[in-house]
A protein has these predicted regions:
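Basic, Lys/Arg- and aromatic-enriched nucleic-acid-binding interface segment
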Residues: 86-89, 93-97, 108, 112-171, ...
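Hydrophobic (often cysteine-bearing) scaffold residues that line and stabilize catalytic clefts
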Residues: 36, 40-43, 91, 95-98, ...
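A Lys/Arg-rich helix-loop hairpin that forms a DNA/phosphate-binding surface
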Residues: 8-16, 35-38, 51-75
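N-terminal helical hairpins
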Residues: 1-31
Length: 218
């Protein structure tokens, strides 16, 4: 009976439009923030556009696998976003990972097996050689920015930017920093900040470099 039931479930899933199912499920999910839901809906729209362009829409969950996701990655890399430019590597990786994250919600309801579809094997792409959209700052460049003589609002914005560079946190998490979460490092050497990131549920401890401490003391 178990095998008959499983076979019946598989046949039913083949008749389900995965994109519609994901969109409808997100609309009814009250466990996520409105901002997160809006972002997920936008990611589904991007994925739907890809499926339409490659002639694979509508699609069911049994046809969503790692090769398809890699095709989506290539599609994003080659899609122009303005005047001959293509989407930067980090953005491509983030878009693909968000789709996989959304699909994990479907796994919770038995619609897809992330391991069987090999989606858990996906790795974010490395920066492409000659990727003009990728912009990095060296430590020396960050130091030069911090050394600029600024006052008032410009100084505050510069300090916040440099602090984000050195602690690696998003703007909303950086804004939440206060004296109460600055602590001595467990090894007694230096200081750390302990925060619960906005999009995470666990506490993280981040070592503070001297320049970061200098900014926080202002």
């Amino acid at each position: 009976k178990k095998f008959i039931y499983k076979d019946t479930m598989e046949k039913e899933k083949q008749n389900i439009n995965a994109v519609h199912w994901l969109r409808n499920t997100l609309a009814l999910d009250r466990t996520i923030k409105d901002s997160t839901r809006a972002d997920y809906v936008k990611q589904i729209k991007f994925f739907e556009a890809f499926l339409n362009e490659v002639g694979k829409y509508p699609i069911n969950f049994s046809d969503i696998n790692l090769p398809l996701i890699k095709d989506y990655e290539s599609y994003l890399f080659n899609k122009e976003v303005g005047k001959g430019k293509t989407t930067k590597t980090t953005t491509v990786g983030n878009k693909v990972e968000k789709i996989i994250c959304i699909l994990k919600r479907a796994e919770q309801q038995g619609m897809i097996d992330i391991h069987e579809s090999k989606l858990d094997k996906y790795k974010k792409p490395q920066s492409r050689q000659g990727d003009e959209n990728e912009i990095y700052l060296t430590e020396d460049e960050i130091d030069k920015i911090y050394a600029l003589r600024l006052t008032g609002r410009e100084e505050e914005v510069r300090d916040l930017f440099v602090l984000q560079c050195w602690i690696g946190q998003r703007f909303s998490d950086t804004q939440a920093i206060n004296e109460g979460i600055i602590k001595e490092a467990p090894n007694g050497k230096g200081k750390v900040i302990e925060i619960v990131q906005e999009k995470k549920t666990h506490r993280v401890s981040i070592p503070l470099l001297p320049v970061a401490i200098d900014i926080l003391n202002k």
